Amino acid sequence: GKLSGISKVLRAIAKFFKGVGKARKQFKEASDLDKNQ
């Protein structure tokens, strides 16, 4: 029904934000390493 469609969308959004958070963390660590050198 309608509810399962909504939960599917929410799950996709959550996965997207988790991926973005991971990428931002890696980017921050990389730029920190850059500064230290």
Swiss-Prot record:
Q: Subcellular localization, per the record?
A: Secreted
Q: In which tissues is it expressed?
A: Expressed by the venom gland.
Its BP terms in the Gene Ontology are: defense response to bacterium; symbiont-mediated hemolysis of host erythrocyte
Please provide the record's keywords in A-Z order: Antibiotic, Antimicrobial, Cytolysis, Hemolysis, Secreted, Toxin
Give the UniProt entry's GO cellular component terms. Answer: extracellular region
Asked if Secreted is a keyword of the record, the answer is yes
Give any GO molecular function from the UniProt entry. toxin activity
Q: Which superkingdom heads the taxonomic lineage of this protein's source?
A: Eukaryota
Q: Which family does it belong to?
A: Belongs to the cationic peptide 02 (oxyopinin-2) family.
Q: What does this protein do?
A: Disrupts biological membranes, particularly those rich in phosphocholine. Has antimicrobial activity against Gram-negative bacterium E.coli, Gram-positive bacteria B.subtilis and S.aureus, and hemolytic activity against sheep, pig and guinea pig red blood cells. Has insecticidal activity against S.frugiperda ovarian cells by opening non-selective ion channels. Enhances the insecticidal activity of spider venom neurotoxic peptides.
Annotated protein name in UniProt:
M-oxotoxin-Ot2c
Q: Which organism does this record belong to?
A: Oxyopes takobius
The taxonomy runs: Eukaryota, Metazoa, Ecdysozoa, Arthropoda, Chelicerata
